[in-house]
Swiss-Prot record:
Annotated protein name in UniProt: Claudin-4
Subcellular location: Cell junction, Tight junction; Cell membrane
Cytoplasmic domain ranges by topology: 1-9, 103-117, 182-209
Region spans: Interactions with TJP1, TJP2 and TJP3: 208-209
Key word Protease present: no
The gene coding this protein: CLDN4
Keyword terms, alphabetized: Cell junction, Cell membrane, Chloride, Chloride channel, Disulfide bond, Ion channel, Ion transport, Membrane, Phosphoprotein, Tight junction, Transmembrane, Transmembrane helix, Transport
Function recorded in the entry: Channel-forming tight junction protein that mediates paracellular chloride transport in the kidney. Plays a critical role in the paracellular reabsorption of filtered chloride in the kidney collecting ducts. Claudins play a major role in tight junction-specific obliteration of the intercellular space, through calcium-independent cell-adhesion activity.
A molecular function GO annotation: chloride channel activity
All ranges on the Extracellular side of the membrane: 31-81, 139-160
Length: 209
């Protein structure tokens, strides 16, 4: 049986990863484009996220606009939005299961059922981590591919935003926390030893006349 400290550590890491996924989803910094004109005053930075894009001027002014339609996003960001939302929901289910199966809670009385619930929670967190790392890595791959593509204009080339690094950190926390929770082994049920006795044969009766 894994110690309570290991279980608490796994839950804490997974919850931090869950919060980081929500931050990754909310921040409009998946892709960053920098336009620098002849005058530094005219320079601006464009942030592209899953829900909106923002234009940051060199003066510090920032204007954000929510996407009018889902079709306004590129295909990789459309898929990323769906997968990240699913990851948040799956991780929330993992948090609920970890609370139910926690050693310090009384939702379940059976220790074996608690351990099995924590294992399921760990698997759910692992799934949530995979659902995050796939869209983040896919978006980063497309950004790097376009950056080194000579056919793409320099003004259209983008760089990786902070949301991608937050997403990688979130997936790492979820995978690590889920892995620790999967170390919960159900306690062995010691079956009482039942000794079987064979009926002793009585000694041969004396012969009666």
């Amino acid at each position: 049986m894994a110690s309570m400290g290991l279980q608490v550590t796994g839950i804490a890491l997974a919850v931090l990863g869950w919060l980081a996924v929500m931050l990754c989803c909310a921040l409009p910094m998946w892709r960053v484009t920098a336009f620098i004109g002849s005058n530094i005053v005219t320079s601006q930075t464009i942030w592209e996220g899953l829900w909106m894009n923002c234009v940051v001027q060199s003066t510090g002014q920032m204007q954000c606009k929510v996407y009018d339609s889902l079709l306004a996003l590129p295909q990789d960001l459309q898929a990323a939005r769906a997968l990240v939302i699913i990851s948040i929901i799956v991780a929330a289910l993992g948090v609920l299961l970890s609370v139910v199966g926690g050693k310090c809670t009384n939702c379940l009385e059976d220790e074996s059922a608690k351990a099995k619930t924590m294992i399921v929670a760990g698997v759910v967190f692992l799934l949530a981590g995979l659902l995050v790392i796939v869209p983040v890595s896919w978006t980063a791959h497309n950004i790097i591919q376009d950056f080194y593509n000579p056919l793409v204009a320099s003004g259209q080339k983008r760089e990786m935003g902070a949301s991608l690094y937050v997403g990688w950190a979130a997936s790492g926390l979820l995978l690590l926390g889920g892995g620790l929770l999967c170390c919960n082994c159900p306690p062995r049920t010691d079956k009482p030893y039942s000794a079987k006795y064979s009926a002793a044969r009585s000694a041969a009766a004396s012969n009666y006349v």
